[in-house]
C-alpha cells in the first residue's frame, strides 16, 4: 500500500486510506484497493470522474447504485462503507472481495461440483431475495456482477441497472446482458421485476453446473430467438433434482416461472442449506437498531465517544466512527465463521440485549431507534415482516386465459379501445361520450394514434381521454393479479372508470 492516498489529487479526500494497486479501469473511473488506516482492513474504492460520467450520461447509474447500497446490510450483498464527494470525483468505499468475479472462477475451474455450485447458488438466492423484500430488482445478474470474498462467499454487486419497484408500476427498460436476460426483457415488454431476476439466476445456475451458457450465439438475432423460444439442452451429467429445478426457472412465460420462495423450498436447494440461510434476515429498520457491543467497544477504544457512535449508527449516519464500526464488524465475523450469517445475527441480538440492559440501568440514554419498542418488552427478536406485495389490484384464482377473456369482454362493454403488447399486457384508451368503435378496426386496435387527445380537456374538440395499461401476473400464493395503471388523463375520471370496470368483472 502507498504510504498515503497519493496521486491524482486524491490525498485530501482519501486521507483516511492508504491507496494501493488498481483493481480495474472502466470508461469513467477506476477501482483501487486501499487500506483503512484506523482499522488496518482492506477496502475497494471506486473513483468516479464526474465530468466523464456527465459526458456518458452515467450519473443516474452511479446515484442508483449508491442509493441502493446505502440501504442494504446483507452477508451476500457488497457492503458500502462511505461515499466521499469532491467537485471532480466521487469516491465509493466498498467491501473488498479478494477473489474477484465469479465469472473468472467459472472460467478457471469449468463446471463445478454440485455441492459447490449449490453453496454458491444458495448465497445468490439469499441476496436476491433480500433485494426483492426491499422492493429492488437487480436486472443485471450475471457472474461478472457476483464477487467472491476471501472465503469464496458470494457478494451481489453492480446495482447500477437496478430499479426500485413501486406498487402497481411495471418496469419497461430493457437492460442487462443479453445472455442472462429474460425473454420479456429483450422483447421490450412490461414486467413486474422479480421474475426477471429468477430467469437470470436460472442461467447462472446452469453456468455453475455446466460450465457453459444455456443460451449462446455470436449472432444476436439468433441468440434472441433461442431465448424467446426457451431453446436449450440439459447435459446428461446433471442430477435429477437439478434437471427439475433449472427448467422451472427458465420458463419463457414469466407468469408460470418459479418464484424465489418456490426455489427456496425446492428439494435440490434445501440440501445442506446453512442455518443462517434457512430464515429471512431482519428488515433494514431492525438491522439499524442492532449494535454489537464488542465492536462498539473496539470503536470507543479508537478514541470515539460511545454516545456519538451509537447515535450515528442508529441514524445511519456516515462518519469516521461508523465506517470503522462496520469494517471491524464485518471482518470480525468473516474471520470467525466465514459467513456473516446466523452467528452474526445471533451475536448481534445477544450483544445488543446485553448492551441495552446495561445501558438502561446506568444511563438515561437508550441506544435504539426512536419510536421503536422497549428492548426489554420485545426481547429484541427480529421482526420478520410479511412480504410486501408487488402491486395492488384484482386477484383471482381463475386461469389466465379465463381472466383475460373476461377482461376483454368488460373492455368491450365499456367501449374501451386496446392494443395488445403481449399475451397478458395491453395498452388501453377510454373516451368519455364517444363510441370507441369510431376509432377501432375490427380487432379493437387503434386506427390512428393522433386523433386522441391526452390532456383530458372536456371543452376541447375531442372528449376527455384516459390512457391506461393492464397487466396480469402471477402472485406468490398461486393467484393471478390484474393490475391497472393510469398513464394520462384525469385521475378522478380514471377512478370512476375503474369502478365501472370492476363491476363488469364481478364474475371473477
From Swiss-Prot:
GO terms for biological process: signal transduction. InterPro entries: KA1/Ssp2_C, KA1_dom, Kinase-like_dom_sf, Prot_kinase_dom, Protein_kinase_ATP_BS, Ser/Thr_kinase_AS, UBA. The keyword Ribonucleoprotein does not apply. GO terms for cellular component: nucleus. Signal peptide: none annotated. Residues 17-269 form the Protein kinase domain. It catalyses: L-seryl-[protein] + ATP = O-phospho-L-seryl-[protein] + ADP + H(+); L-threonyl-[protein] + ATP = O-phospho-L-threonyl-[protein] + ADP + H(+). Its EC number is 2.7.11.1. One of its GO terms (molecular function) is ATP binding. This is Serine/threonine protein kinase OSK3. It comes from Oryza sativa subsp. japonica.
Amino acid at each position: 500500500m502507498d504510504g498515503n492516498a497519493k496521486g491524482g489529487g486524491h490525498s485530501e479526500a482519501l486521507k483516511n486510506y492508504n491507496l494501493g494497486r488498481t483493481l480495474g479501469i472502466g470508461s469513467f473511473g477506476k477501482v483501487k484497493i486501499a487500506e483503512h488506516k484506523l482499522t488496518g482492513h482492506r477496502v475497494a474504492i471506486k473513483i468516479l470522474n464526474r465530468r466523464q460520467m456527465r459526458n456518458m450520461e452515467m450519473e443516474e447509474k452511479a446515484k442508483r447504485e449508491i442509493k441502493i447500497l446505502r440501504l442494504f446490510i446483507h452477508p451476500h450483498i457488497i457492503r458500502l462503507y462511505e461515499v466521499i464527494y469532491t467537485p471532480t470525483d466521487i469516491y465509493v468505499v466498498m467491501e473488498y472481495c479478494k477473489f474477484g468475479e465469479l465469472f473468472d472462477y467459472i472460467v478457471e475451474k469449468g463446471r463445478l461440483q454440485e455441492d459447490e455450485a449449490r453453496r454458491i447458488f444458495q448465497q445468490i438466492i439469499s441476496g436476491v431475495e433480500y433485494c426483492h423484500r426491499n422492493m429492488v430488482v437487480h436486472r443485471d445478474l450475471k457472474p461478472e456482477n457476483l464477487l467472491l470474498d476471501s472465503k469464496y462467499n458470494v457478494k451481489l454487486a453492480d446495482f447500477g441497472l437496478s430499479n426500485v419497484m413501486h406498487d402497481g408500476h411495471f418496469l419497461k427498460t430493457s437492460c442487462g446482458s443479453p445472455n442472462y436476460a429474460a425473454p420479456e426483457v429483450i422483447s421490450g415488454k412490461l414486467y413486474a421485476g422479480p421474475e426477471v431476476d429468477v430467469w437470470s439466476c436460472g442461467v447462472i445456475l446452469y453456468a455453475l453446473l455446466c460450465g457453459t451458457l444455456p443460451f449462446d450465439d455470436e449472432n444476436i438475432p439468433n441468440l434472441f430467438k433461442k431465448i424467446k423460444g426457451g431453446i436449450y439442452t440439459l447435459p446428461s451429467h446433471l442430477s435429477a433434482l437439478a434437471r427439475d429445478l433449472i427448467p422451472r426457472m427458465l420458463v419463457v412465460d414469466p407468469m408460470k416461472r418459479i418464484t424465489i420462495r418456490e426455489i427456496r423450498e425446492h428439494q435440490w436447494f434445501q440440501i445442506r442449506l446453512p442455518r443462517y440461510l434457512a430464515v429471512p434476515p431482519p428488515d433494514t429498520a431492525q438491522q439499524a437498531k442492532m449494535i454489537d457491543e464488542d465492536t462498539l467497544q473496539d470503536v470507543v477504544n479508537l478514541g470515539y465517544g460511545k454516545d456519538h457512535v451509537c447515535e450515528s449508527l442508529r441514524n445511519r449516519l456516515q462518519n469516521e466512527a461508523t465506517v470503522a464500526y462496520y469494517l471491524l464488524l464485518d471482518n470480525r465475523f468473516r474471520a470467525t465463521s466465514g459467513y456473516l450469517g446466523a452467528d452474526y445475527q445471533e451475536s448481534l441480538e445477544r450483544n445488543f440485549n446485553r448492551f441495552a440492559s446495561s445501558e438502561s440501568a446506568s444511563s438515561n440514554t437508550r441506544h435504539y431507534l426512536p419510536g421503536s419498542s422497549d428492548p426489554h418488552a420485545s426481547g429484541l427478536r427480529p421482526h420478520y415482516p410479511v412480504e410486501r406485495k408487488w402491486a395492488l389490484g384484482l386477484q383471482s384464482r381463475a386461469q389466465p386465459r379465463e381472466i383475460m377473456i373476461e377482461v376483454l369482454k368488460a373492455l368491450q362493454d365499456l367501449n374501451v379501445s386496446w392494443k395488445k403488447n403481449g399475451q397478458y399486457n395491453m395498452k388501453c384508451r377510454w373516451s368519455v361520450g364517444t363510441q370507441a368503435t369510431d376509432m377501432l378496426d375490427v380487432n379493437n386496435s387503434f386506427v390512428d394514434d393522433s386523433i386522441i387527445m391526452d390532456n383530458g380537456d372536456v371543452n376541447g374538440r375531442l372528449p376527455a381521454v384516459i390512457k391506461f395499461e393492464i397487466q396480469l401476473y402471477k402472485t406468490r400464493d398461486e393467484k393471478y393479479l390484474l393490475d391497472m395503471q393510469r398513464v394520462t388523463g384525469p385521475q378522478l375520471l380514471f377512478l370512476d372508470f375503474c369502478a365501472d370496470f370492476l363491476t363488469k368483472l364481478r364474475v371473477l
